[in-house]
Design a protein with these regions (language model features):
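Bacterial N-terminal signal peptides
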Residues: 6-21
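Bacterial signal peptide processing site
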Residues: 23-25
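Histidine-rich, glycine-flanked metal-binding segment
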Residues: 33-45, 54, 58-99, 114
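C-terminal cap of metal-dependent C-N hydrolases
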Residues: 52, 352, 441-448, 453, ...
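Divalent metal-coordination and catalytic microenvironments
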Residues: 52, 67, 72, 93, ...
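Acidic, glycine-enriched loop/beta-strand segments at the rims
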Residues: 54-66, 427-434, 438-439, 487-497, ...
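Divalent-metal coordination cores built from histidine and acidic residues
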Residues: 91-96, 100-105, 111-221, 310, ...
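Active-site neighborhoods of metal-dependent hydrolases
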Residues: 167-170, 175-202, 206-230, 240, ...
Length: 581
């Protein structure tokens, strides 16, 4: 029996690691051989999941078996009908699979507000990967002041400065999910340069490299960027290569919200590939898409370019969410130049009549030299207000800006600007920018995994007040229900592989993502006939259905479809982590 978690993933998957890199599929025996079967029958487990259809995460066909768990690990798989167990879960007619890994969650703050991570665990997510561009740490007093409104609203004390201190806080607070994070290069620019929206000097890049090294030692999974937005949009390719080299030295990866998902998507993908090659680092593209109607159909060429890079040895892959609408901050509907210098500078700038007039003109400019989300979404009819921080503004949630403009008696563009000011840039919107067939084409690609690009929400409590994109509630169950069971886009085994072992490999997690002895006991039990998302754009705040049991580190966080009081989630630190305590 394999007991070394660090060797388990490589030993069990064997060729899968290679095949994932090459875009192939690997089959394992229908019923894996388990040494010591007789001994397993006679022993006592903390939990036995009995009579389930095991989809083990390798992509191999399902097999019927029991799964025995002791403490936080899977100990045995096979016929355990004679074994004793403190808890026995009857999985007859159910699928037993590894817990799902969300390659872009946004819950590093949310789990401190509500430790249930309710909308995530009810869709089977047991691990969240966070840190898009601007990460939770490192921060200084000035950066903390910028985030004060949200922290004060939720009554959360920001008592960390470094990533190590954040992980310590996370471990102390505990939640239902495991959380790993990247160090955001946009946040590093803010830390070193303040609100200076310009190219970094050599000295500033050197300081950022020191911070990357520190974050990697503290447990960051690698380096991230969010190049469509301030301050990361001022990062040059050379700057990113230098920072990524440091992450690579510590065993990390580079992961990016690329510079353009729209009119310059080809050039943007080429930049990602350049960084991967020059820094010699595994690379992942977050929420791959070809946005705005003018770019629909370009997914084929985007995938071809990445596939060609993979064929010549670059370790590049991507993830998506299974929806044709995106979500963003309301301020992202404004021209980029309006947002330069940070939130305070933007809010002050928008008070000026000349600035407002120019911003409104640029919002309707089809040739604007930036990702024009307002125009690309079709303007007022294609942008829906999804959430606000100020309770007085919640009457507008779920309305398009066409409707909001009418309700306010003003130009919808003025409504956007006024709401940005009134809610201090804390509002979010849903934008109609993608085509279903492009999403499906990416989904079918073997090396594409999944993400929610959302923080955890809940039907009650402090995270229930605002609406959000339905992906926060149903990304993974939507894949299983719509795209596996109903549409047949993916087989069940392939979908689970993408959600589990492939995702784990991409971010360097070695002890999760498979149903195998020695692996951590992050497991889901769901009904393949009923599992589904029920969240919609109009009524998003609804938990998924069909997810019967969810275990994290051997503890049940969902039992018989209900959230429990267990909070076994842990910080997940990357390969470069060194414990200095």
């Amino acid at each position: 029996m394999i007991t070394c978690a660090s060797c388990t993933l490589a030993a069990v998957l064997g060729g899968l690691v290679l095949s994932a890199a090459c875009g192939g599929a690997t089959q394992s025996p229908t019923q894996p051989a388990q040494p010591g079967a007789a001994a397993a029958q006679a022993r006592t487990f903390d939990v036995v999941i009995a009579n389930g259809r095991v989809v083990d995460g390798t992509g191999a066909p399902w097999f019927r078996a029991d799964v025995g768990i002791t403490a936080d690990r899977i100990i045995a798989i096979g016929n355990l009908s004679g074994a004793r167990a403190s808890t026995r879960i009857d999985a007859t007619g159910q699928v037993v699979a590894p817990g799902f890994i969300d390659l872009l969650g946004q819950s590093e703050f949310n789990v401190l507000v509500d430790s249930r991570a309710a909308s995530k665990i009810t869709q089977g997510i047991t691990t969240e990967i966070t840190g898009e561009g601007v990460s939770i740490a490192p921060v200084d007093d000035r950066m903390m002041a910028d985030r004060k409104a949200s922290y004060d609203f939720f009554k959360i004390a920001q008592d960390w400065r470094t990533l190590d201190e954040y992980f310590a806080r996370l471990a102390k607070s505990s939640s239902t999910v495991n959380v790993g994070t990247f160090v955001g290069s946009g946040g590093l620019r803010d830390y070193v340069m303040g609100k200076e929206d310009r190219v970094a000097t050599a000295d500033e890049v050197a300081k950022m490299k020191v911070l990357v090294a520190e974050a990697m030692v503290h447990g960051a999974l690698g380096l991230s960027s969010s190049l469509q937005y301030v301050p990361n949009r001022f990062s040059t390719t050379d700057e990113l290569v230098e920072l990524a080299k440091v992450a690579a030295e510590h065993g990390g990866i580079y992961i990016t919200h690329q510079r353009s998902e729209g009119n310059r998507v080809f050039e943007s993908v080429d930049e990602v590939l350049t960084i991967a090659e020059r820094a010699d680092i595994p690379t992942e593209i977050w929420h791959l898409k070809t946005a705005y109607k003018a770019n629909w159909g370009k997914m084929t060429e985007v995938l071809r370019r990445i596939e060609a890079a993979r064929a010549r040895g670059l370790r590049v892959s991507a993830n998506i969410y299974p929806y044709d609408r995106a979500s963003n901050g309301l301020d992202a509907c404004l021209p980029v130049w309006v947002r330069e210098g940070g939130t305070d500078a933007m809010l002050k700038r928008l008070q000026e009549p000349d600035t407002r007039a120019r911003a409104k003109r640029d919002m309707d400019d089809p040739n604007a030299p930036f990702e024009n989300q307002w125009y690309g979404s079709g303007g007022a009819a294609g942008v829906m207000l999804s959430s606000v921080l100020d309770p007085a503004l919640r009457k507008y949630e779920g309305m398009t800006f066409e409707a909001i403009g009418k309700a306010m008696g003003k130009d919808p563009r003025d409504a956007v600007i006024d709401l940005v000011i009134a809610d201090k840039a804390e509002s979010s919107v849903i934008i109609s920018i993608m085509r279903e067939s492009d999403v499906v084409e990416a989904m079918r690609t073997p090396w594409v995994s999944f993400d929610t690009d959302s923080g955890a929400r809940a039907e009650d409590g402090p995270l229930s007040a605002s609406k959000s994109h339905p992906r926060a509630w149903g990304t993974f169950t939507r894949v299983l229900g719509k795209y596996v069971r109903e549409d047949g886009v993916l087989t069940l085994e392939e979908a689970v592989r993408k959600m589990t072992s492939q995702a784990a490999i991409r971010v360097g997690i070695t002890d999760r993502g498979l149903v195998r002895p020695g692996m951590m006991a992050d497991l889901v039990v769901f009904d393949p006939a009923t599992v589904a998302d029920v969240a919609t754009f109009e009524q998003p705040n609804r938990y998924s259905i069909g997810m019967r049991h969810v275990l994290v580190n051997g503890k049940s966080v969902v039992a018989n479809g209900a959230i429990t009081a267990e909070r076994p989630g842990r910080p997940l630190r990357g390969a470069g982590y060194r414990d200095s305590r």
